[in-house]
Amino acid sequence: MRVGIPTETKNNEFRVAITPAGVAELTRRGHEVLIQAGAGEGSAITDADFKAAGAQLVGTADQVWADADLLLKVKEPIAAEYGRLRHGQILFTFLHLAASRACTDALLDSGTTSIAYETVQTPDGALPLLAPMSEVAGRLAAQVGAYHLMRTQGGRGVLMGGVPGVEPADVVVIGAGTAGYNAARIANGMGATVTVLDINIDKLRQLDAEFCGRIHTRYSSAYELEGAVKRADLVIGAVLVPGAKAPKLVSNSLVAHMKPGAVLVDIAIDQGGCFEGSRPTTYDHPTFAVHDTLFYCVANMPASVPKTSTYALTNATMPYVLELADHGWRAACRSNPALAKGLSTHEGALLSERVATDLGVPFTEPASVLA
């Protein structure tokens, strides 16, 4: 199979969808790998590195898209790429379709067979391709939150860990999944007072046991959430419903009662965001004001640390890439139910029930295209 990797086009997206190790394994198995020249530069992977591993360097994105049977990306296609989508091609990438009717329509209109990293799901409910980026985003959320709490950045002027005689920052994390756990872990390590809210008691129990009570846990009710948000210096939203739009848990009316200069970091922005006032931002302009608070809603947070996130992502994706390349999408999905969970579109049919519900688009059972 011919596998193509174009340069990422999203704002300040420095990751790349394959490493030289992945190229070497694909070519060892007899596959061709086409990589757009310069695709790895943001992750400090040179064209020479890719070429030495067996890749063929291609001058333009158009050529990669046109020639590849299996196209690997990190982030969803942007509007400028919609015209490159085509029938008969497999697209394997993060998609987050519930938050983008335009991208969904482009995939359906083109007939592309698309598989979303974020909805590949093992029988135990784990999300193996989303997890590494959730780890990165969670850890970054505490860091960028601490940075934007500085008065020079528009925040409250609070130091995360405080100093002797002065209290630390009050950090509230909504969601105790992979991203929320990692955000809480880093915030706790920085010396902040951390409270995590979730409706999953088992996750709260795990946090309590691991951190010996140093991280406070609360069952997430409207009452507890309101009280926690009002007193917080930093709120990190880390709520996930796999494949679906994130629920809006923090209203603008609640934000109006927060401390002036409080910071809200919305990790869930890829799925529409879990704060009512959230809208996607970029690294060029990462924040905006809502009432007297500061919202940070960068939709590709792990892109800022590509030397970490490219390798973390490709370590997880490569086993699935090899299955797709070796066997084709249909046979790979038949033999691997986790991969089949990621099926999103095929020949104009929408195969994700949650996306169909959120966007009001007809749903087709994935089993019907796997038969």
Curated annotation (Swiss-Prot):
Pathway: Amino-acid degradation; L-alanine degradation via dehydrogenase pathway; NH(3) and pyruvate from L-alanine: step 1/1. Binds 1 Mg(2+) ion per subunit. Its cofactor is Mg(2+). Keywords: Magnesium, Metal-binding, NAD, Nucleotide-binding, Oxidoreductase, Secreted. It comes from Mycobacterium tuberculosis (strain CDC 1551 / Oshkosh). It comes from the Bacteria. GO terms for cellular component: extracellular region; plasma membrane. Catalyzes the reversible reductive amination of pyruvate to L-alanine. However, since the physiological environment of M.tuberculosis has a neutral pH, it can be assumed that the enzyme catalyzes exclusively the formation of L-alanine. May play a role in cell wall synthesis as L-alanine is an important constituent of the peptidoglycan layer. Substrate binds at residues 15, 75. This is Alanine dehydrogenase.
